[in-house]
UniProtKB/Swiss-Prot annotation:
GO cellular component, one term: cytoplasm
Record: active site: 381
GO molecular function: [isocitrate dehydrogenase (NADP+)] kinase activity; AMP binding; ATP binding; phosphoprotein phosphatase activity; protein serine/threonine kinase activity
Protein name: Isocitrate dehydrogenase kinase/phosphatase
Homology family: Belongs to the AceK family.
Major localisation: cytoplasm
Kinase found in the keyword field: yes
Reaction catalyzed: L-seryl-[isocitrate dehydrogenase] + ATP = O-phospho-L-seryl-[isocitrate dehydrogenase] + ADP + H(+)
EC number(s) per entry: 2.7.11.5, 3.1.3.-
Organism: Polaromonas sp. (strain JS666 / ATCC BAA-500)
Lineage, highest ranks first: Bacteria, Pseudomonadati, Pseudomonadota, Betaproteobacteria, Burkholderiales
């Protein structure tokens, strides 16, 4: 029970010190995010990548600072239960007019759980559930920007509105031809509005902060007409001339889901009220969990908090059991899942076969590398948890036996909370989105018969995407290491994503070689490797026997990605990266780029200047998504 009186002389001071720690964290986070605009304007791509890596570390640093201060100044760990009750109440009071209350609650949890015994990990002492609403938070200061801006175009002035909308972001680098680009956007919009009657509420709403990632800036918003809303994003890039261009117009939830995918690096965006951004983005992408939206915005700890709450809610409202995940078992990771829940749980094994020359700390280092690196839409993001408790009754006995055999150091089965419920406690686990393993996806097509048109299309799509995934990883200076089909998965949008990280290396750390010609018949006929192989040596031509055993797969692979078997391909990209070049990787199909859709010599007067006349009757169908 909470105390009826706030009579502690120290509780408020502890709460205030904790709030000071959070405010310092978010100010630093926001400042670094805001600097992304200048880095974009000056084409400081290496600085942008460095800032993205470093910003990930901000949170843990501030949590350590705050917990150290509380112990030093208040001996926080020695305070009574009654004092800690009051600390939470005072903290809630400090959140009343706060602009980031949900983040501050999570920060409170992070600091408190570093100090207190786990018996305190309940809603009386920490925020198991949120205490302060994030609805309708507004910054009332006169100079504050609103979360989003609304524009009210007509059929005649939509092109001018697009120009004004972009100029309102005050980018300090000149556009190559903004009027031309606005005409391109207008043409793309007109494809969705040409047969639509504009209603009284026709408007474009755009979030006030630009979204920066890698070499791009993104205008994010939505078009509203009648009962319909269509998500919209405009990528802004540097052209070869060094000026700015609008590169494409993205429409609809699917385009936005790919842009905000869990397989991409986090955005940098200056947000005064992050919950308002999340609410706006959720209205555009209702199928994207709020946890993943917070992750995409760089607020990964909040994403972890919401994910865990969603997970506990799902456990309470489901009855199926955790099981060994389907597919080929890994040599390093033990993977299990809950069939009704769209994520997998990965535990590092205690023992590895001799060919896996690695350690637990090395594997953790690889996963941290992926977390901090540009994932270019091809490496799944993971959430890392410690001391996770599951109901024992929900675990399949075969799964328990598997963990006891391969990862006994990571397993505890006990009634730790002394509440009469036996739990399975996993010491350390990674959680990531479930995908269809690529080997299973291909096997389904083989089983259907490679002569079937649908199966043939599935094989071609999978193999082409697999090669594209590897080439995108190469562009980002990542060598997957183990390139077997089983280490890649298919997402809901048909994208191939890599998810086995224990052997990844930087391209620049590898030595790509051709297999030397045999010097005699004995070497040529030998079943063993007769040439010297260094620890970082890679022989691309040796990939073929492991990947291309199926004729249908080989045909597609050699047609589209045969260069992956040539050491020269890898060496050329290695040289490019070492020379400091940052490659372009687009979070949308290249066919959507205006440079693909419009010929370079096209005259400006050929572009639309306004929407076509509206039809007499349109019903309620609204816009084409």
């Amino acid at each position: 029970m909470f105390p009826q009186r706030l009579d502690s002389t120290i509780a408020y001071d502890i709460a205030k010190a904790m709030m000071d720690g959070f405010n310092r964290h978010y100010q630093l986070f926001r400042t670094e995010s805001a600097r992304a605009k200048h880095r974009f304007e000056t084409a400081d791509w290496h600085g942008q990548q460095r800032a993205q890596r470093e910003r990930i570390e901000f949170y843990d640093l501030r949590v350590r600072e705050a917990s150290t201060r509380l112990e030093r100044e208040f001996k926080a760990g020695e305070q009574s239960m009654d004092v800690w009750h009051q600390v939470k109440l005072h903290y809630i009071g400090l959140l009343v007019n706060h602009h980031q209350p949900e983040l501050a609650e999570t920060f409170f949890n992070s600091v408190t759980t570093k100090i207190l015994h786990r018996s305190y990990f309940q809603n009386d002492f920490i925020f198991v559930r949120p205490a302060v609403s994030t609805e309708y938070i507004e910054n009332e200061e006169p100079t504050a920007q609103p979360t989003y801006r609304a524009y009210y175009p007509t059929r005649d002035n939509l092109r001018e509105i697009i120009v004004r909308l972009v100029r309102d972001f005050d980018l300090r680098l000149e556009f190559e031809d903004l009027e031309r680009d606005a005409g391109y956007v207008l043409e793309a919009v007109s494809e969705r509005l040409s047969d639509v009657k504009l209603r009284a509420n026709f408007q474009i709403q755009v979030l006030s902060g630009l979204f920066f990632r890698n070499k791009g800036a993104y205008v994010v918003g939505k078009i509203i007409n009648g009962f319909n809303e269509v998500p919209l994003a405009l990528p802004i890039l540097h052209s070869k001339s060094g000026k700015l261009v609008i590169d494409a117009a993205l429409f609809g939830e699917d385009d936005l889901l790919i842009l905000f995918s869990f397989a991409r690096a986090y955005f940098m965006v200056d947000m005064g009220i992050p919950s308002a951004y999340v609410q706006f983005l959720r209205s555009m992408m209702p199928h994207m969990p709020r946890a993943e939206i917070y992750n995409a915005l760089g607020l990964a700890k909040q994403g972890k908090t919401l994910f865990y709450r969603d997970f506990l809610h799902h456990l309470r409202h489901s009855t199926d059991k955790f099981r060994i995940a389907p597919g080929i078992k890994g040599m390093v990771m033990l993977v299990f899942d809950l069939p009704s829940f769209p994520y997998v749980f990965k535990v590092i094994k205690d023992y590895y076969p001799p060919q896996k020359d690695t350690s637990r700390e090395q594997i953790k280092g690889k996963y941290l590398l992926v977390k901090q690196h540009d994932r270019v839409g091809r490496m799944a993001d993971t959430q890392e948890y410690s001391e996770v408790a599951f109901p024992r009754a929900r675990f399949d006995d075969e799964l328990i036996a598997e963990i006891e055999k391969f990862a006994p150091s990571q397993l505890e089965i006990s009634d730790r909370d002394r509440d009469g419920n036996t739990e399975v406690i996993i010491k350390h686990v990674y959680i990531e989105r479930r995908m269809i393993p690529l080997n299973i996806y291909l096997q389904e097509a083989f089983d259907a018969g490679v002569g079937e048109p649908a199966a043939k299309n599935q094989i071609e799509r999978a193999v082409v995407e697999y090669g594209n995934a590897i080439k995108d990883l190469v562009a980002a200076n990542i060598f997957p290491g183990d390139m077997l089909w089983k280490n890649f998965g298919i997402t809901r949008h048909g994208k191939v994503v890599f998810y086995d990280y224990d052997e990844i290396e930087y391209i620049t750390d590898c030595k790509f070689r051709r297999v030397p010609a045999p010097r005699n018949d004995e070497e040529e006929m030998s079943g063993e490797v007769w040439y010297s192989v260094g620890p970082k040596d890679v022989f691309p031509e040796t990939f073929a026997p492991f990947l291309l055993g199926n004729d249908a797969v080989r045909e597609v692979f050699m047609k589209h990605h045969g260069d992956l078997l040539d050491a020269e391909f890898w060496q050329s990209h290695q040289a490019r990266i070492q020379a400091g070049h940052v490659h372009d990787v687009f979070p949308y199909e290249r066919e959507k780029r205006f440079t693909r859709r419009h010929s370079p010599g096209r005259n400006d007067h050929e572009l639309l200047t306004h929407l076509p006349p509206e039809p007499m009757l349109t019903g309620l169908s609204g816009m084409t998504p």
